[in-house]
Amino acid sequence: MKKLTIAILVFACSLLASSAYGQQFDAAFGVGTISSSSGTITNGLYFPSDRGGAYPAFSADILLHRRIGFEGEISWRASQDLYGGSQPYRPVFYSFNALWAPKLSKNFTAELLAGIGGEDVRFYGLVNCSNFFGCTNYSSSNHFMGDFGAGLRAYIWHNVFVRPEVRLYLINNNLEFSSNTVVRYGGSLGYSFGGR
């Protein structure tokens, strides 16, 4: 029985090692900005535009088979802005995507992605308390969103890459702002683990 257990463990480890051989993991940090249509006035109410400002972003992906994989990302406004000129707020965007990363040449890889996520608009100055989570100094307005994007990885040194990127966020029921469509564009610096 002991020999059978050892044989099964050795076989399982060899399967895991061979399947992990073809995988690639990438992580990146970048900065960008967002744009959207200009603010509007409806029924005497002003709806500002969800645009401008610096948006740091963290992203990570794993390529599993034939350059297809999964990607996750979070980006947020680096500093608070004023909503309607008086209320401090900060939008946070997060998404989970299917990713296709075809290799274009030795040093260039394209990225095409699509997925789902959300926008969390945090309005500051309001204290909210909960028995389970404690107290926070903001109130959140959350919205479901679709995410479509593209990027171009340019490997500049070994597995280090720079990536210009663009994202289209289609935000459901984005009542606080003038548009349901937001475009984020920027650049990232990243590293590929497990080859490229």
Question: How would you name each of these model-derived features?
Answer:
Residues 1-24, 194-196:
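Cleavable N-terminal export/targeting peptides
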Residues 22-37, 112:
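Transmembrane beta-strand segments of Gram-negative outer membrane beta-barrel proteins
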Residues 26, 56-131, 143-144, 154-158, ...:
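Gram-negative (and chloroplast) outer-membrane scaffold detector with strong preference
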Residues 31, 129, 133-135, 146:
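Gram-negative and organellar
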Residues 34-56, 141-142:
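Surface-exposed strand-loop-strand hairpins of Gram-negative outer-membrane beta-barrel proteins
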Residues 39-40, 122-127, 175-176:
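Short, well-ordered secondary-structure micro-motifs
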Residues 42-47, 81-87, 132-138, 172-177:
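Extracellular loop and loop/strand-boundary signature of outer-membrane beta-barrel proteins
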Residues 151:
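Polyanion-binding surface elements
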